[in-house]
Each structure stands twice: as C-alpha cells, then as structure tokens.
Amino acid sequence: MVSLTTSEVHPTMGVKTFSAGISACLADIITFPLDTAKVRLQIQGEGQTSSTIRYKGVLGTITTLAKTEGWPKLYSGLPAGIQRQISFASLRIGLYDTVQEYFSSGKETPPTLGNRISAGLMTGGVAVFIGQPTEVVKVRLQAQSHLHGIKPRYTGTYNAYRIIATTESFSTLWKGTTPNLMRNVIINRTELVTYDLMKGALVNNQILADDVPCHLLSALVAGFCTTFLASPADVVKTRFINSLPGQYPSVPSCAMTMLTKEGPTAFFKGFVPSFLRLASWNVIMFVCFEQLKKELMKSRQTMDCTT
C-alpha cells in the first residue's frame, strides 16, 4: 500500500483550528503596538477624547504614546487581544476550509468563489458573536488615557469585564456587534478569499511553489485589499464600542455624526497603521499557520508509522 506524502495528507479540523489560534496569537503579540496606534488615531477628534496631545502618523503615534504614557501602554489590552484570537481567529480561520468543503458538497472539483465567500461569511459571523466581549474590552483598554490626572475607567482586563457588565449591563459586552460583523464580513470575504485565490493563482500557474514566498506575497495582497474595504466599518466599530452610554443612540447615528462633523475622510482615520498592522499580521499568521499545519501533520504521520 502506498502511503500519502505529507503534502497530500489534508490537515484535520483540529489541526487547522489549533494552528490558526496559535499563529493568530503570535501575530497579535508582534503587531499589537500598531493596533493600539490605529485605535488612538481612529478615536482622535471625538469630543470625549479631545486633548492637547495630537497623534500624527504611525511612528508619531507610537512614540508619543511611549513618551507620554509609557511603553507598556502600547500593549494595554493585550490579554484581551490574546483571548480574542483564541476565541475568534481559531474559528474564523481554522474552520474556513472545513465549511468550504461542506458547501462544496464533497465534489472533487475546486470550490467555487461562491463557496469560498459563503464559508467566509459563516465562520466570520460565528466568530464575531463568540469573540465580541473580548473585542469590547480590548478596544476600551487601548483607548483609555492616563494623562492629566484622568482616572482610568478600568485597571485591567478582568476588571474591565466586571465594570462593563455591572455598571452598563451584561449585554454591553456585545456592544458594536453590528459594525464588527460588517467589518468581519468584509474582512473574511476579502482576506481569506483573496489569499486563497492569490495563492492558487501563483501555484497553479507555476509562478511560485506552495511555500513561504508564495504565502508571504498572498498575505500582503490580501492585507491591502482587506484594509481598504474594511476601514470605514472598522472606524465606526471602534468609535461605537468606545463610546460612553448614550453618546451614540445607534450605529447609523455614530456614522452620521462622523460624516457631518469630521467629513468622509474620518472613515479612513488610522488607515496606514491599520494596513501595516493587518498586512504584517496576515504575513505572520498565514506563514506560521501554513508551516505549523505541515509540522503537525508530519508529527502525526510519524506517530502513525510507529504505532
């Protein structure tokens, strides 16, 4: 009997989910300062966040934060970010192939674009609902400032969960689910599908082998396309999640307030750090994801051969 090679053995759902979660956590740790800079730029210009400190550009925001609030502030909210990736990315990315195969109904032909989009929408929707509380806590910890003697709303991750649930309501932990769902519908539909299509085009046309350079280029292209399309929903999501009770009656109200007071460019605030963060996050996550899947399947094959 001829055994399958490692490249021919498809990773199990468990391997994909585990690999996605670990890879996403690693990517988040490395790129978190960019995410914090993005949040600060996105909320800049709001009434409640107006201050004498103005952030300019990616490096300017990072250095200003480090000088005025200390380097640790760049990683404020990281525990919630890690929790988010464990509950969110592991499902959104890890289950993508499995759901895609389900929509393909076991056909031997490659999945259609519709199958890929449907898989991205389903995994993204489930992941947003499960991971939304971690998103709320992460954004609020990143947004709060310790300047001018202002007492912070929250002293830490678990304190934030408790304060939000007890002083606002338990349902507030799911605040901003609608714009976050919109954002992740765009991200999943663009990021995973673009990465999938780009990787397939490079490999099938024998431009690049299915290895690190191919994964790197595919991730960069997916990152740019995703950032451009998802930026408006991302800014509205951040503003709405970070808002005080009653500040914005609804998500459309938040969007209209931004448009009338700050203009259409407000929807692209923080675009550069958002792209740098998402592109670098994509590169780290997808490259680690692909390599980790391969190594885990190699280990599994080795164990199967010895038993």
Swiss-Prot record:
Notes on activation and inhibition: Has no constitutive proton transporter activity and has to be activated by long-chain fatty acids/LCFAs. Inhibited by purine nucleotides. Both purine nucleotides and LCFAs bind the cytosolic side of the transporter and directly compete to activate or inhibit it. Activated by noradrenaline and reactive oxygen species. Despite lacking canonical translational encoding for selenocysteine, a small pool of the protein has been observed to selectively incorporate selenocysteine at 'Cys-254'.
Binding site for fatty acid 16:0: K56, K269
Major localisation: mitochondrion
Chain segments annotated as coiled-coil in the UniProt record: none
Function: Mitochondrial protein responsible for thermogenic respiration, a specialized capacity of brown adipose tissue and beige fat that participates in non-shivering adaptive thermogenesis to temperature and diet variations and more generally to the regulation of energy balance. Functions as a long-chain fatty acid/LCFA and proton symporter, simultaneously transporting one LCFA and one proton through the inner mitochondrial membrane. However, LCFAs remaining associated with the transporter via their hydrophobic tails, it results in an apparent transport of protons activated by LCFAs.
Subunit structure: Most probably functions as a monomer. Binds one purine nucleotide per monomer. However, has also been suggested to function as a homodimer or a homotetramer. Tightly associates with cardiolipin in the mitochondrion inner membrane; may stabilize and regulate its activity.
Name of protein: Mitochondrial brown fat uncoupling protein 1
Source taxonomy: Eukaryota, Metazoa, Chordata, Craniata, Vertebrata
